[in-house]
């Protein structure tokens, strides 16, 4: 039986905790039952962090085809990009080429089918911008790389997932004052379609149940506390219903996240970042996973940043990375099973 392709992990900012959590996750691979993964990036940066953290983590420089064979005894690393001179906790714009090279190499493996899914370690936007990175973040970079001539560009959707709660913010990194101007019926409909489609295909939910938070307190109280919920959110929900998607809303966000309410839906779509990320991180601060929906490949990430202040100290918690690795493997396996079934059906029809 052929072993499944491994996951591939980008290094993230070498001055942050990406190397720390990667190494500590691998060190706990047996007790955690982690799926095999390969790191794309600078081996010397990892070796330096091994020494600083006092860990026993041998590295094996290899490619994805041999990663699973090495994984039990050594952390597989595929060298990629320039060497990093960054020190833990000392962000430096000169690290940007190292970060991009790691990400490009990891993505290339996934797009070539040599890795099953992409897991990205955290980067610092300020460092990347100072180094000339032209994208707002990981997600936009990946969407641009996934674009194909003659086809619409992918519409990436950020979902924060845990066993307790899955949420999607319709708008992400915007000042709150700018949110109403960015909300449109088309945006919410497209977001709902992508969420429903990926929850069905990759998460195995036959009929995903979506709820849409109201923008305003009490979901606007029928227009008395703002007009956006009746003018934008409700028409979007009705449009999704006409397409056969199980959608409800707008609903008051303040009563959507207690256990009884959560039992009634699969994904909550919020109108702005903190509306849904506060409950998500309250319920699963260490175990949340950032999943990018709407891309032609699987991408997960720990739901935290670079944490420069604790990089290299041994205090970084790898739990979110562990959850991201496990979810990436689960989604990749589900997609492989679905592709196999579709292939069998196509063959039987032919």
From Swiss-Prot:
Cofactor: Zn(2+); Mg(2+); Co(2+)
Localization: Cytoplasm
EC nos: 1.1.1.262
Residues binding substrate: 138-139, 281, 290, 299
Residues annotated to bind a divalent metal cation: 173, 218, 273
Keywords: Cobalt, Cytoplasm, Magnesium, Metal-binding, NAD, NADP, Oxidoreductase, Pyridoxine biosynthesis, Zinc
RNA-binding among keywords: no
Tree of life domain: Bacteria
GO molecular function, a single term: cobalt ion binding
Cofactor descriptive note: Binds 1 divalent metal cation per subunit. Can use ions such as Zn(2+), Mg(2+) or Co(2+).
GO cellular component terms given for this protein: cytoplasm
Enzyme class, broadest EC rank: oxidoreductase
Gene Ontology biological-process annotations: pyridoxal phosphate biosynthetic process; pyridoxine biosynthetic process
InterPro entries reported for this sequence: PdxA (IPR037510), PdxA_fam (IPR005255)
Pathway annotation from the record: Cofactor biosynthesis; pyridoxine 5'-phosphate biosynthesis; pyridoxine 5'-phosphate from D-erythrose 4-phosphate: step 4/5
Catalysed conversion reaction: 4-(phosphooxy)-L-threonine + NAD(+) = 3-amino-2-oxopropyl phosphate + CO2 + NADH
Misc: The active site is located at the dimer interface.
Subunit composition and interactions: Homodimer.
Family recorded in the similarity comment: Belongs to the PdxA family.
Biological role: Catalyzes the NAD(P)-dependent oxidation of 4-(phosphooxy)-L-threonine (HTP) into 2-amino-3-oxo-4-(phosphooxy)butyric acid which spontaneously decarboxylates to form 3-amino-2-oxopropyl phosphate (AHAP).
Name of the protein: 4-hydroxythreonine-4-phosphate dehydrogenase
Gene name per UniProt: pdxA
């Amino acid at each position: 039986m052929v072993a499944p392709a491994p996951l591939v992990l980008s290094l993230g900012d070498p001055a942050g905790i990406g190397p720390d959590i990667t190494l500590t996750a691998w060190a706990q691979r047996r007790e955690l039952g982690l799926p095999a993964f390969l790191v794309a990036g600078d081996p010397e940066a990892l070796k330096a962090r091994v020494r600083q953290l006092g860990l026993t983590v041998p590295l094996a420089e290899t490619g994805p085809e041999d990663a699973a064979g090495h994984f039990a005894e050594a952390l597989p690393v595929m060298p990629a990009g320039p060497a990093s001179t960054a020190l833990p906790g000392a962000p430096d714009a000169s690290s940007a080429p190292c970060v991009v090279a790691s990400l490009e190499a990891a993505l290339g493996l996934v797009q070539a089918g040599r890795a099953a899914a992409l897991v990205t370690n955290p980067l610092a936007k300020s460092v990347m911008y100072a180094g000339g990175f032209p994208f707002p973040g990981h997600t936009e970079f990946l969407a641009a790389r996934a674009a194909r001539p003659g086809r619409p560009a992918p519409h990436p959707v950020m979902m924060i997932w845990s066993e307790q709660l899955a949420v999607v913010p319709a708008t992400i990194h915007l000042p709150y004052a700018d949110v109403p101007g960015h909300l449109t019926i088309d945006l919410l409909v497209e977001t709902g379609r992508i969420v429903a489609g990926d929850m069905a295909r990759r998460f195995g939910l036959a009929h995903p149940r979506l709820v849409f938070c109201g923008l305003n307190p009490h979901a606007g109280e029928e227009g008395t506390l703002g007009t956006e919920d009746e003018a934008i959110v409700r028409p979007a929900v009705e449009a999704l219903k006409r397409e056969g998607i199980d959608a409800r809303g707008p609903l008051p966000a303040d009563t959507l996240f207690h256990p009884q309410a959560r039992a009634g839906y699969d994904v909550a779509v919020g109108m702005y970042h903190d509306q849904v990320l506060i409950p998500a991180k309250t319920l699963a601060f260490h175990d949340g996973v950032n999943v990018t929906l709407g891309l032609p490949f699987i991408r997960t990430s720990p739901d935290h940043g670079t944490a420069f202040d604790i990089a290299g100290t041994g205090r970084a918690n790898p739990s979110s990375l562990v959850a991201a690795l496990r979810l990436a493997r689960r989604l990749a396996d589900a997609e492989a099973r679905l592709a196999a079934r579709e292939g069998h059906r196509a063959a039987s029809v032919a």
